[in-house]
Amino acid sequence: MQEAYIVAYGRSAAAKAKQGALFHERPDDVAAKVLQGVLKRIDGKFNKNMIEDVIVGTAFPEGLQGQNIARTIALRTGLSDTVPGQTVNRYCSSGLQTIAIAANQIMAGQGDILVAGGVELMSAVPMGGNEPTNNPTLQYDDIGASYPMGLTAENIASHFDVSREDQDAYAVRSHQRAYDAQRDGRFKDEIIPIQVNSVEYTNAGPKVHTNIFDQDEFIRPDTTMEALAKLRTVFKADGTVTAGTSAPLSDGAGFVVLMSGDKVKELGVTPIARFVGYKAVGVDPKIMGIGPAYAIPEVLSLSNLSVEDIDLIELNEAFASQTIASIKEVGLDISRTNVNGGAIALGHPLGATGAMLTARLLNEMGRRPDSRYGMVTMCIGVGMGAAAIFEYVR
């Protein structure tokens, strides 16, 4: 069986939905710019038209993210029209699912060079899509399939005894870690700077300005327990979850390029990390945020590893309550988890998150010569969880 290696990675910076740097951009254009930057990072005798497929995840593949956006991205990237594209949707793990699909295809001998990643501009397609169509039977049966994500976060807080103070403290730490990382330039090598447009509205009419976007927009180093304590709960009158302990609506994109071991040798390309394993699981939709606590043991078992073997973990912070509960349930080491902050401070562009977290993980592993295994994991809407393991090549 072939091994699948990541040979390049990169992400956009994360932007505020509806008001940030990507508000005036198209999702396919943003993704194409990021992918172009990632492809430039591959050494050896690689040629972009050697790519055999472009697999792109998005949580809401409709409107500006519809029409098989993966194929559009491939063409906008400047790839040959012989390079196909497929769009994948597993909600919040879509960008990680594409990496698993590409890796498994390589391991099965069905390809040698594939692109995987994700894009989500929540500025372009709103949360829930343009026309939410929840199944009425599931809604009436009250199994949680139609619950707002914030309500499931409240359920997690109650079920796993996560206090308001615990959530606020976690959010403060996420912002502080992200601020420290940004200040120290730790995100620089994982972010692909892209050219974007901004619009200034004047009495003479709108003026378009061109800017370079390369800084995550959500980090607030001035976040304090006192400030968070003043926020009202959002999803339940007597609840504990606030906007300050939830991931903000975000825009972003991320990609990796995977290559078979044989092709790595043939082209003289430098491998970065080996794909070890991936697992997606289902959980009670009413407590969907606990998904990582079920996916992590499954992927560890599949990979013949223990939690102690994992040197770094990127656990998507959809909400502080579910992140804290998942960490406690699995027994993760907080000193190894989200070391540069997480989604509360860095955003969660849904279908792009898996690929963006993979870029963040590999970038940090590259800075730590003693790290070997890394993990990306997240909860998924409507009651699921996913986790993937990578081995850094030294």
PLM segments and residue spans:
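Conserved catalytic cysteine-centered active-site region
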Residues: E25, T58-G111, P132, I143-L151, ...
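Active-site-proximal alpha-helical scaffold in enzymes
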Residues: N89-V119, A157-F187, F255-D262, I327, ...
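Condensing-enzyme catalytic core mediating Claisen C-C bond formation in acyl metabolism
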Residues: M1-P27, T224-I290, Y294, S301, ...
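N-terminal extracellular/periplasmic Venus flytrap/periplasmic-binding protein-like
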Residues: R11-A13, H24-K33, A169-E266, E329, ...
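Glycine-rich loop/linker segments at domain edges
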Residues: S12-K18, N104-F160, P221, M365
